[in-house]
């Protein structure tokens, strides 16, 4: 099959990790795979994209920016994806057998209209309208702005030939949010269970410098909903009993995203309030430090701090941090799935997660703990792991590896392939006639309302 993935912004994050893993997995099964995206920065993406293992084409980025004065992100993302679909109509999309759209469903009906022989599979990470923060506190104007987009999401999601989701928790959320969706298929994301090659790329100088400390690790995008503050506060409590304890905070960070920049500063202020020394290490800063000293000396100096931030950590840094850490702290509440806990288990690192959402399906009692997200409840678990005897910890590590093998890339790719083959055998989902008229009406309302708000916002 010729498969085309469509993703809004191919940066670094859980959704992007899924796209890359799914594309590589299908490619390994012999399928011809292309990824189309509205934005891809080769200095802020996964190695498979940067190194050319996957064919990535940027379309639909020439008319609309990412935001308008830092606002209207959903409007811009929707417009850019529709523009991308239009560019596919000019030629590249005509040979595609299956489109795999994820994260944003705006283009689904257009793909079905313009490419009637192809099938469209939508992979839902979570209903977008449920990701809006402080929704109940939104002003009337903002609610009016969001309403057409929410209806648009409902109609376009239901137009897909097959809806696939990342967990049973997410399945429940889609069924409650979009009653028209029928029995979404659950295909869990994966981790690459063969880490031999990744082990060769570990930073040995970092490992040596870290050997005299006990490390905790948090991996998440620098967003408020990821609740990284919980890791810092729990670490601050636990460090009172273990002075050689360190916390590494790594994750996706994009300087274009205001929240990423603001939240990192909020976390730094939290460290200062708790009297925790800290340092932020970016790729550029690390390179500059190496100009003045040896790698071993650089890491020795860095690890004198209590909390070390790694914005946009490379795979090598992230894997090394997983290798040296005693416990992974996974802080989001009601996370849709959460690939990070599985990555931790892959490196024999047990997990402490909040007792909600997808982690309840992945973090079992024999590989970690799910605890209410309060620092006073997390600190005792951290203390327990830090002082666990070697034999008990070794048993925990073995169970981690045994469990994570159920989430291999081969398993996910095979399940995705089966879903695509099944949907190709069936007639396409009916979404013509009145459905298109209804969609057009909502789209007209959406565009009119949004453009009015935009004009009011930028009018001098």
From Swiss-Prot:
Q: What is its main location?
A: endoplasmic reticulum
The UniProt record lists the EC number as 2.4.1.132, 2.4.1.257
Q: Which GO terms describe its molecular function?
A: alpha-1,3-mannosyltransferase activity; GDP-Man:Man1GlcNAc2-PP-Dol alpha-1,3-mannosyltransferase activity; GDP-Man:Man2GlcNAc2-PP-dolichol alpha-1,6-mannosyltransferase activity
| Membrane topology per record | Single-pass membrane protein
Q: Which InterPro entries does this chain map to? A: ALG2 (IPR027054), Glyco_trans_1 (IPR001296), Glyco_trans_4-like_N (IPR028098)
Annotated localization: Endoplasmic reticulum membrane
Provide the GO biological process annotations: dolichol-linked oligosaccharide biosynthetic process
Q: What does this protein do?
A: Mannosylates Man(2)GlcNAc(2)-dolichol diphosphate and Man(1)GlcNAc(2)-dolichol diphosphate to form Man(3)GlcNAc(2)-dolichol diphosphate.
Task: Work out whether the entry's keyword set contains Glycosyltransferase.
Answer: yes
Q: Which reaction does it catalyse?
A: a beta-D-Man-(1->4)-beta-D-GlcNAc-(1->4)-alpha-D-GlcNAc-diphospho-di-trans,poly-cis-dolichol + GDP-alpha-D-mannose = an alpha-D-Man-(1->3)-beta-D-Man-(1->4)-beta-D-GlcNAc-(1->4)-alpha-D-GlcNAc-diphospho-di-trans,poly-cis-dolichol + GDP + H(+); an alpha-D-Man-(1->3)-beta-D-Man-(1->4)-beta-D-GlcNAc-(1->4)-alpha-D-GlcNAc-diphospho-di-trans,poly-cis-dolichol + GDP-alpha-D-mannose = an alpha-D-Man-(1->3)-[alpha-D-Man-(1->6)]-beta-D-Man-(1->4)-beta-D-GlcNAc-(1->4)-alpha-D-GlcNAc-diphospho-di-trans,poly-cis-dolichol + GDP + H(+)
Could you tell me the gene encoding this protein?
ALG2
Q: What keywords does the record list, in alphabetical order?
A: Endoplasmic reticulum, Glycoprotein, Glycosyltransferase, Membrane, Transferase, Transmembrane, Transmembrane helix
What pathway annotation does it carry?
Protein modification; protein glycosylation
Looking at the UniProt entry, the stretches that span the membrane are 439-459
Family, as annotated: Belongs to the glycosyltransferase group 1 family.
Source organism per entry reads: Yarrowia lipolytica (strain CLIB 122 / E 150) (Yeast)
The terms describing its cellular component in GO are:
endomembrane system; endoplasmic reticulum membrane
Sites carrying a glycan are: 41, 389
Which Gene3D superfamilies does the record associate with it?
Glycogen Phosphorylase B
Look up keyword Protein biosynthesis and say if it applies. Answer: no
Q: What is this protein called?
A: Alpha-1,3/1,6-mannosyltransferase ALG2
């Amino acid at each position: 099959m010729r498969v085309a993935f469509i993703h809004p912004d191919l940066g670094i994050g859980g959704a992007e990790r899924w796209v890359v893993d799914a594309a590589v997995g299908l490619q390994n099964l012999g399928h011809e795979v292309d990824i189309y995206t509205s934005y891809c920065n080769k200095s802020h993406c996964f190695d498979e994209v940067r190194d050319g293992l996957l064919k990535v084409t940027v379309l639909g980025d020439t008319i609309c920016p990412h935001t308008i004065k830092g606002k209207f992100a959903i409007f811009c993302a929707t417009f850019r994806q529709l523009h991308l679909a239009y560019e596919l109509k000019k030629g590249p999309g005509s040979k595609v057998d299956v489109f795999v759209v994820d994260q944003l469903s705006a283009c689904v009906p257009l793909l079905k209209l313009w490419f009637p022989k192809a099938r469209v599979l939508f992979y839902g990470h979570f209903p977008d309208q449920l990701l809006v923060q402080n929704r109940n506190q939104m002003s009337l104007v903002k609610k009016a702005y969001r309403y057409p987009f929410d209806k648009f999401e409902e109609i376009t999601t239901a137009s897909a030939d097959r809806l696939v989701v990342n967990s049973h928790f997410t399945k429940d959320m889609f069924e409650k949010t979009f009653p028209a969706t029928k029995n979404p298929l659950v295909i869990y994301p994966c981790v690459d269970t063969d880490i031999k090659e990744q082990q060769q790329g570990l930073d040995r100088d970092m490992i040596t410098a870290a050997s005299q400390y006990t490390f905790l690790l948090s991996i998440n995008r620098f967003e408020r909903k990821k609740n990284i503050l919980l890791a810092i506060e729990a670490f601050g409590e636990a460090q009172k009993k273990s002075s050689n304890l360190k916390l590494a905070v790594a994750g996706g960070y994009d300087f274009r995203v205001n929240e990423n920049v603001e939240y990192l500063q909020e976390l730094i202020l939290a460290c200062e309030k708790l009297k925790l020394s800290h340092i932020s290490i970016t790729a550029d800063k690390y390179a500059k430090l190496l100009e003045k000293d040896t790698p071993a000396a650089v890491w020795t100096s860095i690890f004198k701090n209590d909390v070390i931030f790694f914005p946009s950590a490379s795979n090598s840094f992230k894997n090394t941090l997983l290798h040296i850490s005693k416990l992974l702290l996974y802080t989001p509440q009601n996370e849709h799935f959460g690939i990070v806990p599985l990555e931790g288990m892959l490196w024999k690192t047990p997990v402490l997660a909040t007792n909600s959402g997808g982690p309840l399906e992945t973090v079992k009692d024999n590989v970690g703990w799910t605890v209410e997200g309060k620092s006073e409840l997390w600190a005792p678990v951290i203390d327990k792991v830090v002082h666990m005897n070697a034999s008990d910890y070794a048993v925990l590590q073995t169970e981690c590896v045994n469990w994570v093998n159920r989430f291999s890339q081969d398993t996910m790719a095979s399940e995705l392939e089966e879903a695509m083959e099944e949907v190709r055998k069936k007639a396409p989902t009916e979404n013509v006639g009145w459905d298109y008229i209804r969609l057009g009406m909502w789209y007209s309302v959406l565009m009119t309302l949004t453009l009015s708000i935009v004009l009011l916002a930028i009018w001098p």
